[in-house]
Amino acid sequence: MKSVELGPRARRDLTKLRRWLLNRAPSAADRAIDLILSRAEQLAQHSDLGRRKSQNMRELYVSFGAHGYVLQYRVYPDAVVIARIRHSLERR
């Protein structure tokens, strides 16, 4: 089984997302973060779960409320590294 790691930008994205949610929907903040991390952990066994975005990047959509979040990740022989986490409506 592969390990799942948050890259530096993904860690910053998650912190920013949590801060934003705590200011607007405190009750949703922990649920959203828990769901994102839970879906990320599924990549340890199913690294091809997301769609291919480019030759070395995949995206996994995490449904939450009316929209959701997108996890961009790279798959390596022993690890899955989450590169970015963003809201599905966020500009790229």
Swiss-Prot record:
One of its GO terms (biological process) is SOS response. Disruption phenotype: No visible phenotype when deleted singly or as the relBE3 operon. Keywords: Toxin-antitoxin system. It comes from the Bacteria. Pfam families: ParE_toxin. InterPro entries: RelE/ParE_toxin, RelE/ParE_toxin_dom_sf, TA_system_RelE-like_toxin. Toxic component of a type II toxin-antitoxin (TA) system. Its toxic effect is neutralized by coexpression with cognate antitoxin RelB3 but no other ParD or RelB antitoxin. Belongs to the RelE toxin family. This is Toxin RelE3.
